[in-house]
């Protein structure tokens, strides 16, 4: 018989120890990976609920199993909130991840071998936008577009490529681009050749929800996002659309289930519903505004200290530090900062001479530090510490000194108070 008092700590000490160590790591390390964030205890409560027990293949009101009357309410809440938050008239909250949401869009709109225009991974794109190691690069004919010498999307080249290759779909969106995308311009280019415009806004969804970054939903045929990252919800995916046909929406639904997934994760969908409600609160807008301010503050320090920032700045939550001129690799920088309890990720920079496993840059994002309560002053102080480490990358005394400062500020700004 199952009892409420059953717990992991008393049953599986080895697993519990790893879980507790991760909790301590999160509290004692500064998180600057742009795709990571801290979700609320309400979201975690939803994910640890009895909803995890329920199979619910299908969609609200059209399930293949009985006993779905309450999970139907949960999923419909998530759908309605997603539509309201992003100004959409269609939402599918079932994708288990952003990549699976993207897979569903490809499946719904394309046939294998169709031509797709996607942002070059080396210029800030994502694996699912056409990388040869991903399903998107294996199943479709990918034509990459990129950024110009200033570090911004080269719309003239994008338009030229579109007219030359006549893709069936153009992908907007990124995993490491710090500028503002002109969604209207991308739709104009797509319309000029009769292509779909598909936008993956996974990185900026929270900023979009708060009105800090332009909303692609009115411009794109289909939009996907993750529900974590800047949106600060559970790990999962979401598909949105506005002004499309019922036929398109049916195709998208069918591409998710049964096309790519079986039963939805109802406990995660409940977490999405909570996070979407949280994103409608006034404090969420204030939070996202601070995310952008903190990113700009950090860039300012890196530039003052003589570091090159791709595109010269940032208009969202992330930026790339180009270490080529410093004769450092991203791998070295990542490791040294990690020893100081500062977590970043190595990242390729435009025209990177190093392999993706080594790279010549680091990607820095501010959603997680802002969630802890950091403002511009703390963000600038942190950027200065990072420069200290990078300036003395082989000096363990410097790294230990910065680690002490990190532990102190983490204690003052806990993740969960």
Swiss-Prot record:
<comment type="pathway">
    <text>Amino-acid biosynthesis; glycine biosynthesis; glycine from L-serine: step 1/1.</text>
</comment>
<dbReference type="InterPro" id="IPR001085">
    <property type="entry name" value="Ser_HO-MeTrfase"/>
</dbReference>
<dbReference type="GO" id="GO:0005829">
    <property type="term" value="C:cytosol"/>
</dbReference>
<feature type="modified residue" description="N6-acetyllysine">
    <location>
        <position position="375"/>
    </location>
</feature>
<dbReference type="InterPro" id="IPR049943">
    <property type="entry name" value="Ser_HO-MeTrfase-like"/>
</dbReference>
<feature type="site" description="Plays an important role in substrate specificity">
    <location>
        <position position="228"/>
    </location>
</feature>
<dbReference type="GO" id="GO:0019264">
    <property type="term" value="P:glycine biosynthetic process from serine"/>
</dbReference>
<feature type="modified residue" description="N6-acetyllysine">
    <location>
        <position position="250"/>
    </location>
</feature>
<dbReference type="GO" id="GO:0004372">
    <property type="term" value="F:glycine hydroxymethyltransferase activity"/>
</dbReference>
<dbReference type="GO" id="GO:0030170">
    <property type="term" value="F:pyridoxal phosphate binding"/>
</dbReference>
<keyword id="KW-0963">Cytoplasm</keyword>
<dbReference type="GO" id="GO:0035999">
    <property type="term" value="P:tetrahydrofolate interconversion"/>
</dbReference>
<protein>
    <recommendedName>
        <fullName>Serine hydroxymethyltransferase</fullName>
        <ecNumber>2.1.2.1</ecNumber>
    </recommendedName>
</protein>
<comment type="subunit">
    <text>Homodimer.</text>
</comment>
<keyword id="KW-0028">Amino-acid biosynthesis</keyword>
<feature type="binding site">
    <location>
        <begin position="355"/>
        <end position="357"/>
    </location>
    <ligand>
        <name>(6S)-5,6,7,8-tetrahydrofolate</name>
    </ligand>
</feature>
<dbReference type="InterPro" id="IPR039429">
    <property type="entry name" value="SHMT-like_dom"/>
</dbReference>
<dbReference type="InterPro" id="IPR015422">
    <property type="entry name" value="PyrdxlP-dep_Trfase_small"/>
</dbReference>
<feature type="binding site">
    <location>
        <begin position="125"/>
        <end position="127"/>
    </location>
    <ligand>
        <name>(6S)-5,6,7,8-tetrahydrofolate</name>
    </ligand>
</feature>
<keyword id="KW-0808">Transferase</keyword>
<feature type="modified residue" description="N6-acetyllysine">
    <location>
        <position position="354"/>
    </location>
</feature>
<feature type="modified residue" description="N6-acetyllysine">
    <location>
        <position position="54"/>
    </location>
</feature>
<feature type="modified residue" description="N6-(pyridoxal phosphate)lysine">
    <location>
        <position position="229"/>
    </location>
</feature>
<dbReference type="Pfam" id="PF00464">
    <property type="entry name" value="SHMT"/>
</dbReference>
<keyword id="KW-0663">Pyridoxal phosphate</keyword>
<keyword id="KW-0007">Acetylation</keyword>
<feature type="modified residue" description="N6-acetyllysine">
    <location>
        <position position="285"/>
    </location>
</feature>
<comment type="pathway">
    <text>One-carbon metabolism; tetrahydrofolate interconversion.</text>
</comment>
<dbReference type="InterPro" id="IPR019798">
    <property type="entry name" value="Ser_HO-MeTrfase_PLP_BS"/>
</dbReference>
<feature type="binding site">
    <location>
        <position position="121"/>
    </location>
    <ligand>
        <name>(6S)-5,6,7,8-tetrahydrofolate</name>
    </ligand>
</feature>
<comment type="function">
    <text>Catalyzes the reversible interconversion of serine and glycine with tetrahydrofolate (THF) serving as the one-carbon carrier. This reaction serves as the major source of one-carbon groups required for the biosynthesis of purines, thymidylate, methionine, and other important biomolecules. Also exhibits THF-independent aldolase activity toward beta-hydroxyamino acids, producing glycine and aldehydes, via a retro-aldol mechanism.</text>
</comment>
<keyword id="KW-0554">One-carbon metabolism</keyword>
<dbReference type="InterPro" id="IPR015421">
    <property type="entry name" value="PyrdxlP-dep_Trfase_major"/>
</dbReference>
<dbReference type="InterPro" id="IPR015424">
    <property type="entry name" value="PyrdxlP-dep_Trfase"/>
</dbReference>
<comment type="similarity">
    <text>Belongs to the SHMT family.</text>
</comment>
